[in-house]
UniProtKB/Swiss-Prot annotation:
The keyword Amino-acid biosynthesis does not apply. Its EC number is 5.1.1.3. It catalyses: L-glutamate = D-glutamate. This is Glutamate racemase. One of its GO terms (molecular function) is glutamate racemase activity. Pathway: Cell wall biogenesis; peptidoglycan biosynthesis. Keywords: Cell shape, Cell wall biogenesis/degradation, Isomerase, Peptidoglycan synthesis.
Amino acid sequence: MKIGIFDSGIGGLSVLHQAMITMPEADYIFYADVDNVPYGEKTREEVRKLVDHAVGFLVDKGCQAIVLACNTATSAAISYLREKYKLPIIGIEPAVKPAVEHTSETGRRVMVVSTPVTAKGEKLKRLIDKYDDKHVVDVVALPKLVRFAQDDDFDSSDVTDYLKCEFAPYNLNDYSELVLGCTHFNYFKDSFAKLFPDDLEMVDGNTGVSNNLKNTVMKKGIFTEKDKGKKGSVEYYYSDRKMESEAEMKHIKKLHERLERMRQI
């Protein structure tokens, strides 16, 4: 069973990381379009074209299901891709529903942080319209955070100063929920935790999309008896280039280690 996981950059490793925990039997191909990151500052048409190329690449590699581990790509391209390709394509979306539901206990607000494309997109608007009947959700675009992540700059003073500047119009004590609406943002949970109240709950779509992936491949018969108990594998591609050198794999290992630390926050 071969599964493709796509993102504009290294953010999607957080989805891969969770998928490997949820379904360790799978053989994964992770594709990060690092030559064209960040997607959140491009037009929807540009994003759609880039994602179409990456999905075609994964299909050619024999993937039987594909996860768009990118909120921006999901928002801009998933409907088009599902019409074009016959295999299951699973998207990720900001976890607005559980965050809003939790505010019934806390009586406070929800902040959704995302890229500009996701923030302005119809998909997020529909989610908020559907679940935010008490109007407790605020959306903040953090485009530079993707660039920080791609530069391995996770906890510098530049990151802290940027977040403080973007959050300056808001009283952060008003928020009990922070929805991470971009997979790159999982690398910065420690930075968010320093700025928000101690009881802040950070939610992302990683567990939900991993469970959805598992349910889909079981239902479609992609996961078969021969996959049970099997030890899976991972191949990594950066914009069509396979990552194989010792230095490249060492760097990817470090990113997984950071994501595991952030998962514990």
